[in-house]
Amino acid sequence: MKTIDANTIINREKLSPLQWMVFILGFFVFFCDGLDTGIIGFIAPALLDDWGITKPQLAPVLSAALVGMSIGAIISGPLSDKFGRKGVIVFTSLLFSIFTILCGFANSTQDLMIYRFITGVGLGAAMPNISTIVSEYMPVKRKAFLTGLAGCGFMLGISCGGVLSAYLLESYGWAKVIIIGGSIPLILVVALLLKLPESTQYLITRHQQDKAQRILEDIQGHSFQEPVKLVLTQAENASDENPVKVVLGKYLWGSSMLWLCCFTSLLVFYLLTSWMPTILKTAGFSTQQFSLIAAIFPFGGVIGATIMGWYMDKLNPTTVIKYSYLIAFALFIVAGLVSSNIFLLGLTIFLIGALLAGAQSSLLPLAAMFYPAVCRAVGVSWMHGIGRIGAILGAFFGSLIFTFNLSLSGIFFILALPTFISFIALSLKVIYEKSKNKQVLKLEESL
């Protein structure tokens, strides 16, 4: 019986139709996740007017989904590593689709808060798991680029929510806009059931050789000529280890820095996506102006994540992302200085999106590359879940902005600080990894 490393087939230069299918499905899961995540922020000004509620009264509604996302991400990782990626992705995609539609029929802030919480559980569970499975199917030389490119669907989804709101909100109302946003993922769920394969790395670690073999034969385009035993590299094949113990053991320092980075990054990201339309409206911008400027932010993230993914495959991926946060920090200062000029503000918001939102999108493929298969879903999901706690705080801090009557310039100056902390966290991760590598080299030289 011939022994074959499954990754040698996946890592071929040319992607197979099955790998492209995983990429496309991953992109659309990210797109729908972004659409249903961001759409509540775009309809928030209309919701305030329609229901006659105050901004602090709306804050729990905006935060409910973020609480759900944190819970969904944290609990889905162990479930995915135990029961498989596909089932978790399909179920959670269906969950956030149905409850986003129900949001359009809510009659009170309490109903809307409950629906958004359950929506958030689905959104939070789907994203890290689809990122994991896309990463596992992409060849190593283009893993960061293609995984990051699929992740751009999230930013495009948020932008699409802004465009829908800009052209439909005033004519059709907030309820129809959010129902449209929830209906699109229902089509995707059918495609996921029919076309998304299970992770071959998961199947091999769970000793399901026959299923993994059929998928790998599909990727290479022909059957194996003799009986084979599929294996993974030594780092990937520690299937008997407890994934939680692996994350909290030898990967603890790197995990801690990823958690801190994701926490502060998502705090800023979700404060902007949840409250930017309302902040800009309060500053005097029209509905079309604030919707389009707010949509520019995640669209910049699409450009940024694409470029970063390419560089992450060529250079140290952590270093690429950390400098993106540093430049984003400087751009927040610039945004505060040019906030009175709509053209310069829009341009700066686009660049912040390219660097901050692009870096945030790139954290998922970075984490997927950092962890081995045995704990990859747990590691990625926990980073995402802990980061969502920052998102929750971001949504609440957004409501406090109006309490303190901060100027638009003051808001941008404040947002620069957590962005700088993200840079520091990744810098510490790089320093630790370099120190650890030097220790390994010294040990090898002494033997």
Regions flagged by a language model, labelled:
Residues 95, 99, 110-118, 343-351:
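Paired small-residue
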Residues 71-109:
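Conserved MFS/SLC helix-loop-helix module at the cytosolic interface between two early adjacent transmembrane helices
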Residues 1-35:
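Cytosolic juxtamembrane N-terminal segment immediately preceding the first transmembrane helix
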Residues 52, 84, 105-111, 122, ...:
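Helix-breaking motifs and short loop linkers at transmembrane-helix boundaries and internal kinks
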Residues 142-170, 184-185, 384-394:
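Glycine-rich segments within core transmembrane alpha-helices of 12-TM secondary carriers
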